[in-house]
Amino acid sequence: MLGLPRVKTCGQEDLNSDGFADWDSETEKFLSRNYGDFICPTKTHMVPPVFESKHRRSDADNGDKTEKSFFDLLQKFGESREQLGEGMFIVHSYNFKEMISDWNEKQTKLEMKWVLGEHDFVLLHPIKGIVFFQVKASCTTKEKFSEANKQIDKDMQSLRAFAAANLPKAMQKKVNKMLYCCPGFVVMPNCPRPNSQQMPSNGIFKEDCETVESFANWWNWKSNGMVKIDQELFKCLVMR
């Protein structure tokens, strides 16, 4: 699996135990206790289970309101897929910090640096893989869309860095292929869909977010181009 270091636990399994356990085993135990179907989910798991505001007064912040509406939409969408035996994990506000190599043009050399940020939403699907969503409350695509795309670039950088540090080469290639086919989406629930000539291919607009059915139509359309993920890689991503 991830091959992460051994950690000190709060107790000993038996008198012969030194109190240490490997990270993979402890993570799997936690997931088994809290999400019994995590290897092949048949239910939708919201993580955290309720929307957590980023501000003390979420009613005063339009960004929080918009994220909350999309959180609710994803939850209802996920629940609707359970009838088809299709489960998933939907993670909100996941902070990441990964080390990446970056080319310094002035000094003409590779340098190591941190990429930090927050995934607005990450959807982990046992067949379609990982999908990043960045949510913007703006009523127009001007500036905010390109800003969200930069955030999605960081989302993808963080996952590639995680894969490079923790996964074998074969799985790293699968991660890269998955991100190439499904690089992430900008969600703008308050912005009407632009005309066909101006509409970005990775945009989700007001018309797509009005009902569970409209979002399901968008999903059915876009998910056709997503790469099927294998179970071992899915398990690694859930454990992340």
What are these regions (language model features)?
Residues M1-R240:
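Intrinsically disordered, low-complexity Ser/Thr/Pro/Gly-rich regulatory segments
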